């Protein structure tokens, strides 16, 4: 296996990305916990253009960004009224700091769309409703994007309290107006989508929805506003007014269509991380190879491991490939064992410092106001009794950490990771290191 092929291809991709950076939504935080770079996020697949703006306001890219009609394999679970934070980066892989160029001034908004499948829905078309927006703040004399820069790229909102449970696409949007005064005008949109499952017993469905693309066009005043020579009239946000719980909604408990929609989203059944996932990178996960005690078994395991490595690199998003490189190191160890006559394995996976394993980093941000806003994040570590409360997603005998009290879920799975779904809390759950059942 010539590993340099992976390295050369990635260097070429990331070098081209550095040439022209704007911004891209890379990471979803749920209640201040990072779900991992690229995890549950629809984002552009080409690193060289991932941060480029959407200039065609009539294109399907307006829904969830470039390549946004294709879903990813993971869906992140969120609870009722959860705080969602969307991280924007000027460089998708965080190779350099920055959220967006200070010159790119303009408004922000967050939309949601209830869907039958967060993975399979194309996102294009009707059903989108706005839950928050902010344009120019007269009190601070700053545009929303300027606040975003001040807060290291974090934009945070609370999910409306009465939204019906089920699958949703959550869509943060930035609009840069620095070239809106040109001829022809060049408003620049930056957006992406997070695939989420809302665990809620509430029943409200917003009735005031719009089409994306379609809610705004090149003739809309909101995209032609001259920020360098502002008119006397205040800026008007694009799209509908934000949804207000209990006011602009209907119940989903009436009507055959609503009843059917409610029935098959009563419990999350797609996009879950398998219990046997050993390492993740964005929406990919590696499954440990079968145990072996013979030379043939060793080489079979090596082949399986390298095949998974190829898939990981092939589907790695512009946010990077840290988990792939960690998995690659595991495959190298297996291969060297086979070559050296060590036919018992596989060896224990060695996780390198800072690798994107389980894609879960406990990161705490200041509490979000009910109307949303932009906030910076900081980290925290807590411990209880003789066991430390897990902040990296790992638990069990090997590391002395419990999931009890963890932001990542209170159940410790059979393979030693924290979570809250049946895969973590059911068969094999380690009761000594968390809650089961």
UniProtKB/Swiss-Prot annotation:
GO CC, alphabetical: extracellular region
Main subcellular location: secreted
Induction: Expression is slowly increased in cellulose-inducible conditions (in Avicel- and wheat bran-containing complex medium).
EC number: 1.14.99.56
Cofactor: record remark: Binds 1 copper ion per subunit.
Ranges of residues in domain Chitin-binding type-1: 392-437
One term of GO molecular function: metal ion binding
S-S bonds: 64-193, 395-412, 403-418, 411-425, 429-436
Compartments, as annotated in UniProt: Secreted
Essential cofactor(s): Cu(2+)
Enzyme class, UniProt record, top EC level: oxidoreductase
Free-text biotechnology note from the record: Lignocellulose is the most abundant polymeric composite on Earth and is a recalcitrant but promising renewable substrate for industrial biotechnology applications. Together with cellobiose dehydrogenases (CDHs) an enzymatic system capable of oxidative cellulose cleavage is formed, which increases the efficiency of cellulases and put LPMOs at focus of biofuel research.
Annotated family: Belongs to the polysaccharide monooxygenase AA9 family.
Role according to the record: Lytic polysaccharide monooxygenase (LPMO) that depolymerizes crystalline and amorphous polysaccharides via the oxidation of scissile alpha- or beta-(1-4)-glycosidic bonds, yielding C1 and C4 oxidation products. Catalysis by LPMOs requires the reduction of the active-site copper from Cu(II) to Cu(I) by a reducing agent and H(2)O(2) or O(2) as a cosubstrate.
Name of the protein in question: AA9 family lytic polysaccharide monooxygenase H
UniProt source species: Botryotinia fuckeliana (strain B05.10)
Taxonomic lineage: Eukaryota, Fungi, Dikarya, Ascomycota, Pezizomycotina
Name of the encoding gene: AA9H
């Amino acid at each position: 296996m010539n590993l340099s092929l992976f390295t050369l291809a990635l260097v070429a991709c990331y070098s081209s990305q550095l040439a022209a950076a704007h911004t891209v939504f890379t990471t979803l935080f749920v209640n201040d916990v990072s779900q991992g770079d690229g995890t549950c996020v629809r984002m552009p697949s080409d690193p060289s253009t991932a941060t480029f703006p959407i200039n065609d306001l009539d294109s399907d890219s307006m829904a969830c960004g470039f390549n946004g009609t294709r879903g990813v394999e993971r869906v992140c679970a969120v609870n009722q009224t959860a705080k969602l934070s969307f991280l924007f980066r000027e460089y998708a892989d965080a190779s350099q700091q920055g959220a967006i160029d200070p010159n790119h001034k303009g408004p922000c908004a967050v939309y949601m769309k209830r869907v039958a499948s967060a993975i399979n829905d194309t996102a294009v078309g009707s059903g989108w409703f706005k839950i928050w927006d902010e344009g120019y703040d007269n009190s601070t004399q700053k545009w929303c994007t300027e606040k975003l820069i001040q807060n290291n790229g974090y934009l945070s909102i609370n999910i409306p309290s009465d939204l019906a449970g089920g699958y949703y696409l959550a869509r943060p949007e930035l609009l840069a107006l620095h070239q809106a005064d040109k001829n022809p005008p060049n408003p620049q949109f930056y957006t992406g989508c997070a695939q989420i499952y809302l665990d809620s017993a509430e029943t409200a469905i917003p009735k005031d929805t719009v089409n994306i693309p379609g809610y705004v066009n090149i003739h809309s005043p909101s995209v032609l506003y001259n920020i360098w020579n502002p008119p006397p009239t205040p800026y008007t946000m694009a799209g509908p007014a934000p949804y207000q719980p209990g006011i602009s909604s209907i119940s989903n408990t009436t009507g055959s269509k609503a009843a059917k929609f409610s029935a098959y989203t009563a419990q999350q059944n797609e996009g879950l991380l398998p219990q046997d996932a050993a390492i993740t990178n964005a929406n990919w996960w590696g499954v440990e190879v079968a145990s072996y005690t013979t030379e043939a078994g060793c080489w079979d395991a090596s082949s399986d491991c390298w095949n998974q490595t190829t898939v990981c690199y092939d589907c790695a998003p512009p946010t990077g490939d840290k988990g792939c490189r960690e998995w690659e190191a595991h495959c190298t160890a297996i291969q060297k064992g086979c070559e050296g006559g060590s036919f018992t394995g596989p060896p224990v996976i060695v996780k390198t410092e800072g690798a994107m394993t389980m894609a879960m980093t406990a990161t705490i941000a200041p509490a979000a106001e009910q109307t949303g806003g932009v906030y910076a994040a900081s980290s925290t570590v807590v411990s209880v009794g003789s066991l430390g409360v897990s902040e990296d997603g790992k638990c069990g005998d090997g590391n002395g950490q419990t999931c009890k009290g963890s932001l990542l879920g209170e159940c410790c799975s059979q393979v030693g990771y924290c979570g809250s779904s049946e895969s973590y809390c059911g068969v094999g759950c380690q009761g000594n290191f968390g809650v089961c059942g």
